[in-house]
């Protein structure tokens, strides 16, 4: 996962039944190098100044550099796992957000999940933000669901605040209700 803060990639290996059971096996953060950070920042600035989104040669070059960085670090992450952990069923891929405006029904992430899946030879699930926006969300669906799963054993009210390029919160009321923004 990578967001608008342009700091790096967060990887998590999670074992889950897809509902309530969630076990975090490993987390790792890979900091962007200056070149990647500057390229993504330049791309965001161009789109902000132009007030429109377009894909051109520069966009595709930056996207390829970003995907190369992702693939390199997936390889490193996988190489550090034990043999029993290396069987990965799927990768949830959230590319770097370069445009995000849920009120205008738009969120664009850098990184083509089809190219990633073909390169790493593991199925990739993506496009979380846009699917959430189409369902009247704010475009940040993964973290609240994760929070609900990891705090499912407590009956206390919990608020988790994510302060990044786009801040959001998860408010868990006991074991039953989830409010997110």
Question: What spans do the regions from the language model cover?
Answer:
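Short acidic/glycine-rich loops and adjacent helix/strand connectors
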Residues: 1-181
């Amino acid at each position: 996962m990578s967001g608008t803060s342009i700091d790096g990639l967060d990887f998590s290996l999670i074992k889950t039944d897809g509902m309530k059971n969630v076990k975090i096996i490993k987390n790792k953060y890979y900091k962007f190098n200056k070149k990647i950070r500057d390229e993504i920042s330049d791309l965001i600035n161009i789109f902000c100044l132009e007030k429109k989104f377009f894909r051109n040669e520069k966009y595709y070059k930056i996207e390829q550099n970003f995907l190369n960085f992702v693939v390199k670090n997936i390889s490193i992450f996988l190489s550090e796992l034990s043999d029993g952990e290396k069987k990965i069923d799927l990768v949830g891929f959230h590319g770097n957000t370069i445009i995000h405006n849920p009120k205008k029904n738009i969120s664009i992430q850098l990184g083509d999940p089809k190219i990633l899946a073909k390169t790493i030879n593991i199925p990739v699930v993506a496009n979380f933000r846009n699917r959430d926006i189409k369902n009247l969300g704010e475009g940040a669906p993964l973290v609240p669901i994760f929070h609900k799963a990891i705090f499912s054993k407590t009956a206390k009210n919990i608020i988790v605040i994510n302060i990044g390029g786009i801040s959001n919160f998860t408010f868990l009321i006991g074991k039953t209700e989830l409010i997110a923004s």
